[in-house]
UniProtKB/Swiss-Prot annotation:
The keyword Disulfide bond does not apply. This is Glutathione S-transferase-like protein FUS3. It holds the Pfam family GST_N. Residues 80-206 form the GST C-terminal domain. GO terms for cellular component: cytoplasm; nucleus. CDD domains: GST_C_EF1Bgamma_like, GST_N_EF1Bgamma. Residues 1-74 form the GST N-terminal domain. Signal peptide: none annotated. It comes from Gibberella fujikuroi (strain CBS 195.34 / IMI 58289 / NRRL A-6831) (Bakanae and foot rot disease fungus). The lineage of its organism: Eukaryota, Fungi, Dikarya, Ascomycota, Pezizomycotina. Belongs to the GST superfamily. InterPro entries: EF-GSTs, Glutathione-S-Trfase_C-like, Glutathione-S-Trfase_C_sf, Glutathione_S-Trfase, Glutathione_S-Trfase_N, GST_C, Thioredoxin-like_sf. Its EC number is 2.5.1.-. Glutathione S-transferase-like protein; part of the gene cluster that mediates the biosynthesis of the mycotoxin fusarin C. Within the cluster, FUS1, FUS2, FUS8 and FUS9 are sufficient for fusarin production. The other FUS cluster members are not essential for fusarin C biosynthesis. Disruption phenotype: Does not alter fusarin C production.
Length: 210
């Protein structure tokens, strides 16, 4: 399963015309090697190393660095204090309110954990809350901040990638037309569609432990 946190980084690089090299990687092996841990002591991925040896972890930090390192920095990160703060607000919203919930809902569905009814119910309630907040906001505009793609949009689309693949099925999508339209607008944007690929929507999500 693709690491959803990487897509926002790759999309920001694409908009900035920055070529990123993605080396071969085996989870639990590469990130436990002495060479990797020397550069990234926490052993976490994604991890970034620049041509000058600059090393960075945490996907939001890497995405911000890549976004700030090219000609579209002001578009991606905001042209003034207010737009920058709004972009950061939405990035934080996805990180705190939606991504952990998506993990709880997806992991058992892809064989990386056991189904737990209490966790499932709580996580689904939280996802509904997050999508409802987005639905209301996106009723005022097609994108999260302004009228061009920002790092907020790229982060949001990356965060919801697994959700649309495994959880937000057709009946659920009908409840959030603004969110679906926004998601498609982001991932089908000609500048980043190569990164996100064709939208992969689940028709009926798996229920219980079936």
């Amino acid at each position: 399963m693709p690491n959803a946190r990487v897509f926002k980084i790759l999309a920001a690089a694409k908009l900035n015309n920055i070529a990123l090299e993605i080396p071969a990687y085996q989870h639990g092996v590469t990130n436990k090697s002495a060479e990797f841990l020397l550069k990234f002591p926490a052993g976490k991925v994604p991890a970034f190393e620049g041509p000058d040896g600059f090393c960075l972890v945490e996907s939001d930090a890497i995405a911000q660095y890549v976004a700030q390192s090219g000609p579209q920095a002001s578009q991606l990160l905001g042209q003034d204090a207010m737009s920058s703060a709004k972009i950061r607000q939405w990035i934080s919203f996805f990180a705190e309110e939606i991504y952990p919930t998506v993990l709880d809902l997806v992991m058992w569905r892809v064989g990386l954990g056991a189904f737990d009814e209490t966790t499932e119910t709580k996580a689904l309630t939280q996802l509904v809350y997050g999508l409802s907040v987005l639905e209301k906001h996106l009723g005022t505009g097609a994108l999260l901040v302004g009228d061009k793609l920002t790092l907020a949009d790229l982060t949001g689309a990356s965060t919801l990638l697994w959700a649309f693949m495994h959880i937000v099925d057709e009946p659920m999508r009908q409840q959030y037309p603004n969110v679906v339209a926004w998601y498609l607008k982001v991932v089908q944007n000609e500048e980043v569609e190569e990164v996100f690929g064709k939208p992969n929507f689940i028709e009926k999500r798996r229920l219980g432990a079936k």
